[in-house]
């Protein structure tokens, strides 16, 4: 494998038409030093590009495809839904059906509002938190990505915790100053924020498992401490489970860790591969959202019938037994990748949460973004390119994890481990 002639030509055609030739930056493959590969079709755990190369896929559209590509049930029900109409701008039954499933399985959610993306979900949840508490500031964690809303595109300055600085041109400093940022898993920095800014702290927003720094689980007691201190301070705790929701566990990460937030943001899996997001939580908080309350949120395509249908038939197929099988396969893949790297003297650290795995090229244990950044990016790029040539599709970024689906077979896992052994051997002998 390695013939990507048609992909190269397709990218040349796209570059003058879209910023960087893509509609989301990471897809440009800049960090791995090659042209993006254009995909054409997928089925189960496999995906095929426009040059005819087939891959075992661990990107899965960045996580949503927990049943694999083109699941038969989801596709059939989407065909039926499409024939009835693609959008109504009116209530319909599948909104209610999906809402019932979400409320049944997510411990924190009594009431849920459907939106169109994870970014919409986090932006709306923060507006709700500010409106409900009457406070302005929020606390987020370095390396935790919550979408591209202005108040969330913030990085930390110097010191334990500082007033935020914009992480992108176009974000006003006046907006950034209401966002406080500390390191993930750093309880003492969180304590400082509460002691210094507690009276105006509306919310703490956190990924219960950080998935945008390469899969970093919480340290023991971290989430529990956030829960205790937010309750004591009258601050809302928001779990961003856009990535972890229904992927880390049957009842999401909050069910696995036994920590219940005030609000939860969802996306990815609950849309079955279609654009979707949701936020929900305690009834007394959610009833502040219009039309029940004064805090405004709306969307033309929110709860559209296609996304709701795909989401409903995705979640309705998932069982508790599936998550046990996820764990078994993920443990095997984790162990196999680690053994392959060790065999060839490749420095590495590996983390796992449910069916998410993060492989870092560093000898240091990775428990926050600072440690994730010690990973050798050149080594990752070589690994990515080697695996792609071996027929394994991984995310083209060190700071994204890999995902498993119910469609991944034991043979897929073993083939992936064997490919990694060959790639690591080639890297070690250069």
Swiss-Prot record:
Enzyme class: isomerase
Molecular function per GO: glutamate-1-semialdehyde 2,1-aminomutase activity; pyridoxal phosphate binding; transaminase activity
InterPro entries, A to Z: 4pyrrol_synth_GluAld_NH2Trfase, Aminotrans_3, Aminotrans_3_PPA_site, PyrdxlP-dep_Trfase, PyrdxlP-dep_Trfase_major, PyrdxlP-dep_Trfase_small
Annotated catalysed reactions: (S)-4-amino-5-oxopentanoate = 5-aminolevulinate
Enzyme nomenclature, EC number: 5.4.3.8
Keywords from the UniProt entry: Cytoplasm, Isomerase, Porphyrin biosynthesis, Pyridoxal phosphate
Any one biological process term the GO annotation gives: protoporphyrinogen IX biosynthetic process
Modified residues (N6-(pyridoxal phosphate)lysine): 268
Family named by the database record: Belongs to the class-III pyridoxal-phosphate-dependent aminotransferase family. HemL subfamily.
Protein's name in the database: Glutamate-1-semialdehyde 2,1-aminomutase 2
Organism: Shouchella clausii (strain KSM-K16) (Alkalihalobacillus clausii)
Gene: hemL2
